[in-house]
Amino acid sequence: MIQIKNLSCGYNKIAVVDNISIDISEGAFIGIIGKNGAGKTTLLKALSGLLKPYSGNIFLNGTDIYKMKKNLLAKKLSFMPQNMPLDFPFIVKDFIMFGRFPHMNFFKYALKQDYEKIEEIMDFTETKEFAERNILELSGGERQKVLIAQTLAQETDIIAFDEPTSHLDIGSQSSIFRLLRILNKKHGKTIITTIHDLNAAGEFCSNLILMDKGTIFSSGTATEVLNYKDIETVYNTTVVVKTNPVSNKPVVIPVFSDNK
């Protein structure tokens, strides 16, 4: 259980997230949605212990994460940032191994169990086929899978992703979201991710948090959050909301008029 209580945080003494309180249950698949600048990434950074709050607390199973040792937190919660710079020609399997650091001994030597875990993760993420390749040679979708593999190598129960499908085609997006859903449904991982694609958020996430101007505008199931009134208010655009005939999940469709 994650409890966020009266959290305010930001940069240069300016609050980007303002007095947020919400609970996240174990095993949930949470999608954080909202316009650019709403505070989604800032909230994830605070949740991951990377950004100290101006006020408020974040508790993980009753313990304030900012009072936990970093190595202990890294064994409980992992975070994959958006657009992580990949400027050095790492071999893919070596790059994934970096995720094992919290579990390694004092000298940071990889042991047999670390190599076995990496093999298991590469199988799961379908990255073994390019394990020996230079990471700079990979496509956008392949790189994202490698980043996910490195994040999974931390072997945490809670995983936070910042826009894991940004700049990817629909096929790569679907592949990654299916991967996250398997992690959630079959492996019991708690997934928290920011998403710009409202329809992907509604399709794959168990619950959504709609942010606006640093606050939580609404939260709940996809059907509860993705209603046309709230979406039009937050995004300042006209939409209609239909139902996917296969999944029965809401589909948000922007409406454009030649008269405007």
For every predicted segment, state its role:
Residues 33-35:
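The feature captures the beta-strand-to-loop junction immediately N-terminal to the Walker
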Residues 48:
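Helix-to-loop junction immediately C-terminal to a conserved catalytic motif
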Residues 56-64, 73:
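Conserved ABC transporter NBD signature motif
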Residues 97, 112-130, 155:
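Conserved ABC ATPase "signature" region
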Residues 134-138, 142:
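Conserved ABC ATPase signature
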Residues 159-163:
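Catalytic Walker B motif of ABC-type/P-loop ATPase nucleotide-binding domains
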